């Protein structure tokens, strides 16, 4: 190692040094050898990193909402129940919160259009409309109606911002004791009904 020092002529308070390290031996890679399990270790580390990355990606997608492609086939469109109530033996098990004004007007349009399409006299519009499909003719009418009624497949954040996260939670189901469970088995089967029109 060689050393070079210099004192500044202007001020003798400090001095600086250069140290030069001479490489007597060149760097050799002969002693480097891969571990025999390095491929296995690399595979598992890569898999762990990929799983953690996908966990964060899916978490972000569930928070922001993934874009849904438009379905070409009308029969493939999902049927959504909005404002539905479940009645079990005359008691109300749960109900959803009332609809916002804009979505209420969409469902008024839905009801009026359905009134024009229907030919059955015994169908009831509004409260008490059964969610279950009665016969094949009703299913054909629903497919025809759903193909002509196009609901946009996105959520407008301005309308939904007035509702909090807790507004979408269902109330807790009732506690059923052993004596009541026998009564429910013998009672009428549960049916769903729409509760759409609220003023």
Curated annotation (Swiss-Prot):
Lineage top rank: taxon: Eukaryota
Localisation: Cell membrane; Endoplasmic reticulum membrane
Record's bilayer topology term: Single-pass membrane protein
Key words of the record: Cell membrane, Endoplasmic reticulum, Glycoprotein, Membrane, Transmembrane, Transmembrane helix
Parts of the chain that traverse the membrane: 39-59
InterPro entries reported in the protein's UniProt record: MRAP
Glycosylated residues, chain numbering: 6
Gene Ontology molecular function: any one: type 3 melanocortin receptor binding
Tissues in which the UniProt entry reports expression: Expressed in adult brain.
One GO cellular component, as annotated: endoplasmic reticulum membrane
Listed Pfam families: MRAP (PF15183)
Keyword field contains Repressor: no
Entry's Gene Ontology BP terms: energy homeostasis; energy reserve metabolic process; positive regulation of adenylate cyclase-activating G protein-coupled receptor signaling pathway; protein localization to plasma membrane; regulation of adenylate cyclase-activating G protein-coupled receptor signaling pathway; response to starvation
Subunit description: Interacts with mc4r.
Protein family: Belongs to the MRAP family.
Function: Activator of melanocortin receptor 4 (mc4r), a receptor involved in energy homeostasis. Plays a role after larval development in the control of energy homeostasis and body weight regulation by increasing ligand-sensitivity of mc4r and mc4r-mediated generation of cAMP once the zebrafish begins feeding, increasing the capacity for regulated feeding and growth.
Additional remark text: Two paralogs of MRAP2 are present in zebrafish: mrap2a, which plays a role during larval development and mrap2b, which constitutes the ortholog of mammalian MRAP2.
Protein name: Melanocortin-2 receptor accessory protein 2B
Biological source species: Danio rerio
Gene that specifies this protein: mrap2b
């Amino acid at each position: 190692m060689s050393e070079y020092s210099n004192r500044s002529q202007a001020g003798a308070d400090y001095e600086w040094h250069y140290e030069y390290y001479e490489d007597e031996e060149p760097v050799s890679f002969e002693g480097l050898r891969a571990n025999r399990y390095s491929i296995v270790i690399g595979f598992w580390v890569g898999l762990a990193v990929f799983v953690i990355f996908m966990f964060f990606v899916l978490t972000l997608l569930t928070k922001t909402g993934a874009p849904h492609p438009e379905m070409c086939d009308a029969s493939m469109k999902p049927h959504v129940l909005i404002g539905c109530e479940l009645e079990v033996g005359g008691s109300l098990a749960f109900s959803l919160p009332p609809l916002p004004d804009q979505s209420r007007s969409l469902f008024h349009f839905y009801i009026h259009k359905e009134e024009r399409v229907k030919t059955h006299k015994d169908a009831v519009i509004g409260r008490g409309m059964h969610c279950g499909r009665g016969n094949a003719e009703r299913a054909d009418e629903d497919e025809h109606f759903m193909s002509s009624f196009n609901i946009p497949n996105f959520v407008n954040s301005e309308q939904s911002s007035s509702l909090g996260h807790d507004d979408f939670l269902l109330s807790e189901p009732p506690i059923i004791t052993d004596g009541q469970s026998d009564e429910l088995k013998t009672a009428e089967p549960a049916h769903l009904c729409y509760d759409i029109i609220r003023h």
